[in-house]
């Protein structure tokens, strides 16, 4: 556990985790729910994200404009986000306004009246349409489909336009009642705060009890261990390409090895992919590797955007780099540089109360240990050349890698 982090549980079962940062005069507060697009059926595709929008539209005490005016009047910045496994409302504000901001976020989370739903449908449909016009974003969804197929992890967070256009209010309200329950909620805060005071505020939250017969257990997802091809035809200047396969889950102790491997391979401006594809050959402006971790699986992937004339060479270079990282040990210089890069990001993010809040929230939501900064740095320092080689060999085998592409012509 971090030196200043504390975890408590309210009488209703809500978990509360806080981290005191006495050197600041602000607080970052998040109300997190263990629900996202992974928890949807095909008939609900996109309801988690749509519901996130609707939480801002009105409560018994505030209209949508009054919610915005209230936050502005408290000098707060606020927003919300939905992922495949979580949804959360969050705000940053002066510490003197903690009570008021907490009450407002709590009312939005649990007492939304879902007014003006049709106008917000149109907003979300426009967001989906905008996303469709961004091939550099959409290609990651096609890769997820190739890896996870017709499972919740294979579907996009925004969902399907026909579902959003037609899903009725009672179905949205039922989803809210079944997912926004005490056992699924974590209150997280970081900044100049008092833990016991935050717990007292959380005690006032009154989520619905878990409906009879409803379970929050996750259905296991079994990613494809055989590579697949997904191609989407679109009139684009560049071809947007993702290559990737199943990765490690978020509880895997090798997540620190993965962070260092990513830095070496494609996660920094001195990485192998950046140097070879962009700097040495000029084949792309944007190229890199990335990883995602979920409860029981993950993704390890590469992205490149390049013009049609460069597609073949870019893919050939990336293939060669995949072979090299998988079969040849990295140098000690590369390893040291990557470790310092990862540690630097950890330390710099620790200077943000919002980043600290998000880190302790995710750890609590997913039953992970709350590591101190020194503990995380020690785990990065402990990564060895052998561990990098072993993980790269496991994740980057050609037989398990899928390819997704958005471009003009599949041939």
Predicted regions mapped to residue ranges:
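Short, cationic low-complexity segments
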Residues: 270
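Active/ligand-binding-proximal structured segments within catalytic/core domains
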Residues: 13, 20-71, 180, 253-265, ...
